[in-house]
């Protein structure tokens, strides 16, 4: 039984649980009554019967989800500074956990808002009649299906948030995996949610199969770690790892298998193969969650296992070389694949793979053991800062595609042609999001990449020969960590080609459809706010404030 203090610590998660319960109950409230046995008296039970008009409104589930996620988002933000507590021996609340739940709930809140336009609830929807045209009949059936699925979608969205929030707070490896699977199972269904579309069902099947194999591999690795240590608490595992004499095969293989599961979550090569299909088949708001919140969840797991458990106090980590190689392959493969993609959602999926490579390179630099405490913290701050602001411009780009999806578009590059003529503000926002993803100053995407590169260079500082009189001898003498920074720089330059291509087709190509975009007032305003924040957190007091917030959170990692 949770105490009042523990319930207060878990208020965001308790709010989501309440939201799930209300989303199930409220739409089913009606005038049903129950007769008391052996009497003629009937008492109202309110579940079933003819549903009340106010609670049967198909917009109710979305309102419940948006309200619950908003409360969780705001409370997480308010608790970033000073959050501290423990619940049940498997949950630990710190500034870091609240920082990450702030990221998770923010991404899910934006997705919920966008879904009100991507899958709108129509109160005027009716059943088709015999004299209706074929096109009208299809439209009416589609509207009724959207109404029918409102509860399912928003319950799943809140379940994803609940799993992610609990995962961030996990102080036990088993509990962390349970929370990851709670979020993952709901995400599999969300990817395949529009199963009436061919790409939706196929994407969901691929994502589920690959994700299930990755999860099974990770859980098997966890069992090997338990056989080795006899405990799954992170602090106990860290103590056992530090005291390990030599390399225990159970421990090493177990950690390696768990990294397969985490690699799938962050879309690292070669575990990224299902990601492009999943992003392309899912609705744009859901794809945005996969590219931001799901990726952040995977990196939290990587931090727990690689940084908190297996990172030695001195010297190189066991996984340094392997992770560095995976990072370079991931960023290069992602950018090369994005160059050849003509589907905007697949392009953003490969872009997400590349960004995973950038952050894995930073984690690998920490594993080199060359940095002191301050430089290590600098790199971790850069990663968490990047995960945070990625919600602004990566999810923002998917929200722009969500506006096109309301017209049945967004699956071809041609759908973006002439967007500046149809809606200059939205086209301008999309272009800013692309520049931020590429890392162009003075946007927040540039600052996060600069911090990662600066941190990696600081870690490798002093490893090159000062007596070298040419570039080649110096390059041979410098530590390989330095080349991770160079890989990020070169890949960022490569990515400019496909990000700028989006801008070119929006501003210089003729539109296939010259009608203005649909109003979508709240979605439009959300996109514009994300655009402003993308610039605001790239320089000046905005960047300083967010960096201070992230730095305080990382110090609690």
Predicted features along the sequence, with ranges:
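Alpha-helical transmembrane segments of multi-pass membrane proteins predominantly involved
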Residues: 1-557
């Amino acid at each position: 039984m949770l105490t009042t203090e523990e319930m207060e610590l878990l208020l965001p998660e308790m709010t989501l649980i309440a939201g799930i319960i209300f989303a199930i109950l409220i739409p089913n409230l009606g005038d049903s009554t129950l007769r008391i046995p052996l009497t003629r008296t009937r008492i109202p039970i309110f579940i079933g019967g003819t549903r009340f008009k106010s609670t049967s409104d198909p917009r109710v589930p979305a309102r419940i989800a948006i309200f619950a996620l908003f409360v969780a988002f705001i409370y997480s933000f308010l608790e970033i500074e000073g959050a501290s507590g423990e619940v049940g021996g498997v949950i630990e609340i710190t500034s870091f956990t609240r920082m990450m739940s702030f990221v998770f709930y923010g991404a899910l809140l934006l997705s919920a808002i966008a879904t009100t336009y991507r899958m709108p609830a129509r109160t005027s929807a009716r059943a088709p009649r015999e004299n209706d045209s074929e096109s009208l009949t299809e439209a009416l059936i589609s509207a009724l299906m959207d109404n029918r699925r409102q509860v399912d979608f928003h319950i799943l969205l809140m379940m994803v948030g609940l799993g992610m929030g609990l995962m961030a707070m996990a102080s036990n490896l088993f509990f962390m995996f349970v929370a990851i699977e709670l979020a993952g199972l709901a995400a599999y269904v969300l990817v395949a949610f529009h199963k009436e579309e061919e790409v939706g069902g196929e994407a969901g099947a691929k994502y589920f199969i690959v994700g299930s194999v990755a999860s099974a591999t990770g859980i098997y690795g966890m069992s090997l770690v338990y056989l080795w240590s006899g405990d799954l608490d992170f602090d106990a595992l860290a103590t056992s790892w530090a005291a390990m004499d030599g390399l225990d095969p159970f421990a090493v293989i177990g950690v390696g298998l768990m990294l397969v599961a985490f690699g799938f979550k962050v879309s690292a090569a070669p575990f990224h193969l299902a990601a492009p299909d999943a992003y392309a088949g899912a609705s744009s708001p859901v794809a945005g969650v996969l590219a931001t919140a799901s990726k952040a969840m995977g990196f939290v797991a990587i931090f727990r296992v690689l940084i908190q458990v297996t990172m030695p106090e001195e010297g190189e980590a066991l996984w340094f070389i392997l992770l560095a190689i995976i990072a370079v392959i991931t960023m290069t493969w992602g950018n090369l694949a994005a160059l050849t993609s003509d589907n905007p959602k697949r392009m953003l999926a490969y872009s997400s793979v590349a960004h995973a490579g950038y952050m894995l390179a930073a984690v690998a630099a920490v594993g080199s053991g060359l940095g002191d405490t301050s430089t290590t913290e600098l790199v971790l701050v850069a990663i968490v800062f990047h995960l945070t602001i990625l919600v602004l411009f990566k999810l923002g780009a998917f929200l722009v595609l969500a506006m096109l999806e309301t017209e049945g578009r967004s699956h071809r590059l041609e759908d973006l042609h002439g967007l500046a003529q149809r809606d200059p503000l939205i086209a301008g926002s999309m272009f800013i999001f692309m520049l931020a993803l590429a890392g162009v100053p003075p946007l927040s995407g540039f600052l996060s990449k600069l911090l990662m590169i600066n941190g990696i260079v600081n870690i490798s500082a002093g490893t090159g020969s000062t007596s070298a009189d040419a570039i080649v001898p110096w390059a041979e003498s410098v530590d390989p960590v330095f080349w991770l920074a160079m890989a990020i720089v070169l890949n960022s330059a490569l990515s400019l080609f496909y990000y700028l291509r989006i801008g070119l087709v929006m501003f210089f190509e003729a539109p296939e459809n010259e009608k203005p975009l649909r109003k979508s007032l709240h979605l439009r305003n959300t996109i514009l706010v994300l655009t402003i924040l993308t610039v605001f957190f790239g320089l000046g007091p905005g960047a300083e404030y967010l960096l201070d917030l992230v730095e305080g959170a990382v110090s609690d990692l």
